[in-house]
């Protein structure tokens, strides 16, 4: 599929998604598959979770738009799915949801020789992140934090 057609298809599908209060995160067209696979990753514009029903409901109008556009001149399989959970914690909701979970904190090393700290997510405030490292609470100022990701802890 030509890049121009993919871009046109993306524009059309974004309009359909907007009508359903959805946002398209990505469209991947796998022309090396037989039949061609069109994968669309969606999320809700209000930040709520995507359900299986949301994906199913979006499938029909998305498929209709693809058919009416005549941009795909071959048989295809349409897959609609959610963005899924990212390992990186960014929103306040993430920090509330994953309180007590193991995290890896990447540090900027401005004030520390360590690159990473691992522990259990304890608390997030406006100024700092607190993690539990082997029973001791460590407060890390946010200006020292580059990234916070979920991880698995080893003894």
Swiss-Prot record:
GO CC field: cytosol
Pfam families, A to Z: RimP_N
Keywords: Cytoplasm, Ribosome biogenesis
Superkingdom assignment: Bacteria
Recorded coiled-coil stretches: none
Keyword Amino-acid biosynthesis: no
Cell compartment(s), UniProt: Cytoplasm
Transmembrane segment boundaries: none
BP-aspect Gene Ontology terms: ribosomal small subunit assembly; translation
Keyword Membrane: no
PANTHER family the UniProt entry points to: RIBOSOME MATURATION FACTOR RIMP (PTHR33867:SF1)
Homology family: Belongs to the RimP family.
Function recorded in the entry: Required for maturation of 30S ribosomal subunits.
UniProt protein name: Ribosome maturation factor RimP
Chain's gene name: rimP
